[in-house]
Amino acid sequence: MALKTLQALIFLGLFAASCLAQAPAPAPITFLPPVESPSPVVTPTAEPPAPVASPPIPANEPTPVPTTPPTVSPPTTSPTTSPVASPPKPYALAPGPSGPTPAPAPAPRADGPVADSALTNKAFLVSTVIAGALYAVLA
């Protein structure tokens, strides 16, 4: 009986793995920048007076080179007409003389499959458990 139980657990594991493989990918996680907290209030402490410093000695700095303003070049002339590509042709069928015009296909739903469809992951998992239990009992 232990062999049948082990087989049933392997069976359930394979079906659970396939169920998880069919699950939609998770939405990407966006990290928000950390909120900067205000710095704590620093209580002033009594500090000894700073010693009197002598004035700094001026260094001989080179004089900056005068810059000339940029010159404005006259605008270049471009051709008066530029080649324009024609819009692409649709891939739909052209209406025939005796046939009806094809109707546009409905747009796919943006939110994915219907939530209460018959083959959701929960239903698949429950049916897998039932099949595994039947396999363990009857096999």
UniProtKB/Swiss-Prot annotation:
Lipid attachment locations (GPI-anchor amidated aspartate): 116
Cellular component terms per the entry's GO annotation: plasma membrane; side of membrane
Modified-residue entries (Pyrrolidone carboxylic acid), positions: 22
Top-level taxonomic group: Eukaryota
Biased composition (Pro residues): 46-77, 97-107
Keywords: Cell membrane, Glycoprotein, GPI-anchor, Lipoprotein, Membrane, Proteoglycan, Pyrrolidone carboxylic acid, Signal
Post-translational modification: O-glycosylated on the hydroxyproline residues.
Mode of membrane association: Lipid-anchor; GPI-anchor
Residue ranges of the propeptide: 117-139
Chief place where the protein resides: membrane
Location within or outside the cell: Cell membrane
Annotated tissue distribution: Expressed at a low level in roots.
Signal peptide: 1-21
Region: Disordered, residue numbers: 30-115
Protein family: Belongs to the classical AGP family.
Biological function: Proteoglycan that seems to be implicated in diverse developmental roles such as differentiation, cell-cell recognition, embryogenesis and programmed cell death.
Protein name: Classical arabinogalactan protein 3
Organism: Arabidopsis thaliana
